[in-house]
Amino acid sequence: MEIMQPTMRRQPACFAALLLLALCTAAPAQSTQIKLDPAKTHISWTLGDVLHTVEGTFQLKSGSIAFDAQTGDASGQIVVDAASGNSGNGMRDSKMKKDVLESAKYPEIVFTPKHVSGYVAGQDNSTVQVAGEFTIHGGTHPLTLNLPITVKGNQVEAHTQFDVPYEQWGMKNPSTLFLKVSNTVQIKIEAAGELQMVK
């Protein structure tokens, strides 16, 4: 028994060392950065009314997200041109920009990420949750986005959708006596960009 005891004592230590090595090998990169391409990123919106559904688009000005894979702490900004709203109807779009968004006074719509939950797989599909602040029409509101992500090489694609209760957030409802519209706008984003993982 005295001969076997040193070997038995060494086994837990060896196991712990192997486990630590495995965890370190499997650990994700310390920092993940995603830079969006405005030309490949599409932002659409949908607003329902009593007669039909109005659909339109916005243009991304710039977008980047960086986050620490260990802590989830995030930074960056996704910036949308508020004056780029386009539904294909000039009169309606002019009213939206002037009376609802007041884009001359509030030219940008901004999402600022604060925390990311989940892990971006190196060459696969994954889903993360991005919690942050959404600023529109001079007001800032908490917003969490669920983002399915696909990575191919250093290229990344992601999509998400969420609702903006614009009337509740202080913007004017453009309804008239004879035409009532919803007080919530649905936003859909199909984003594409470049992924960089930094150790």
Regions found by a protein language model. Name each.
Residues 29-199:
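Low-complexity, acidic/polar, glycine-enriched regions of mature
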Residues 14-24:
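Bacterial N-terminal signal peptides
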Residues 2-16:
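Bacterial N-terminal signal peptides that target proteins for export
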